[in-house]
Design a protein with these regions (language model features):
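Core alpha/beta nucleotide-donor-binding catalytic domains of modification enzymes
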Residues: 1-171
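ATP/NTP-dependent adenylation/nucleotidyl-transfer catalytic domains that generate, transfer
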Residues: 162-201
């Protein structure tokens, strides 16, 4: 049985392995999904749009595409700029949007925000966005990709350490896991308690 999610929803899909896995999972769960793809107006962004468009056409999946709407503010990092534009697009849609954020993303975000003195978790729900896979590890998602032979594209920016989140993902998290191999379990407990608190509100 699929998760307790709306029967009709958008799925944020970048074309990467995480979002392609979640899209496949929801389609197999007989959900009425429309792919919401955002083009970040980079060479890879244009390539990813072609990939997602081709996949949706081949599999008869509805698709909407969002694009950059304003120039970058000099005070914003590129990561902030792309994220803000992407979420503006999601908020413009006429229904809930499921994203593929997983437990490893939460660990990364918690670490990133800790460096700024305010450790935070990724919420399960905010405005139109639903993140139902926050207790699922990246390895579990990749296992689904391998088992179902799901195609995907890889964003080279994920390996570019000039981006703070990439640097944390590629360098700091591996070292943190050596110090505390149970870090994911610690964060998972925080996530599940946070979800329970959200549901009570």
């Amino acid at each position: 049985e699929c998760l307790d999610l709306p029967e009709k929803t958008y799925v944020a899909c970048s074309g990467g392995p995480d979002s392609m896995a979640i899209l496949d999972f929801l389609i197999r769960g007989k959900r009425d999904v429309t792919v919401a793809h955002f083009n970040h107006d980079t060479p890879f962004g244009r390539f990813a749009e072609k990939f997602v468009k081709s996949y949706c056409e081949k599999n008869d999946i509805k698709l909407v595409i969002g694009n950059i709407q304003k120039e970058k503010d000099s005070k914003e990092s590129w990561e902030e700029y792309w994220r803000n534009e992407r979420y503006k697009f999601f908020e413009s849609l006429d229904g809930p949007v499921i994203t593929a954020h997983h437990l490893d993303d939460v660990v990364e975000w918690w670490t990133f925000t800790s460096f700024h003195g305010n450790p935070r978790l990724i919420p399960y729900r905010r405005n139109k966005t639903i993140r139902p896979f926050l207790s699922t590890t990246k390895d579990e998602i990749w296992n689904w990709v391998d088992r179902k032979d799901i195609p995907y594209v890889t964003d080279p920016g994920n390996f570019d350490d000039k981006f703070a989140r990439s640097y944390i993902r590629n360098n700091i998290i591996p070292q943190a896991l050596k110090i505390n191999p149970g870090l994911r379990k610690v964060i998972k407990k925080k996530v599940e308690k946070h979800y329970e608190d959200e549901e009570r509100e």
